[in-house]
Amino acid sequence: DYVGLMNAALLLEDPVLVIEHVDLYTSRGQAPVEDYDYQIELGKAKVVKAGSDLTVLTYMNMVSKSLDAVAEAGVDAEVIDLRWLDRASLDWDTIGESIRKTNAVMIVEQGVQGTSYGTWLSDEIQRRFFDHLDQPVLRVHGREASPSISKVLEQEAIAKTEDIVRALATAKQGFGSN
């Protein structure tokens, strides 16, 4: 996705900020072999894993952690990589389709609660899809600590797979008889 995202960003006439997460530098994935002009569609999220019990909205390095947690928890969750995070390009069609199917949402991000993207996203989801939600929007986020002080504190501050697994267990309680 990175190649496609960067190529799409380079062709936009407006200013673009591409955020590269350091944890993704060592990750492996598929890349276009011969199509060096490959692009992902502007404003299009990617359903990484289909599911019917819960919609997991995430981005960057938390995508793989979310997939690991979903597998570990045994929840039939739909995991969506948002890809484009600006308000104008957010893929509300994909998000809405998934929410109408699952009736439950969890936002997974690495950042801390107060200053996070998920704060705005959660609020907007409740405004747009309130009638389709069977439980409150759940959020997994980092702890209230500055990740720039030391590597040890940084590792303690960021959200982990175990945090996602615990939140998935909470979500399962809201499924009713499932």
Language-model features: locations:
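Thiamine diphosphate
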Residues: V22-N178
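Short, surface-exposed beta-edge/turn micro-motifs
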Residues: D14-P15, D53
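Internal gly/pro-rich beta-alpha loop/helix module
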Residues: D1-D14
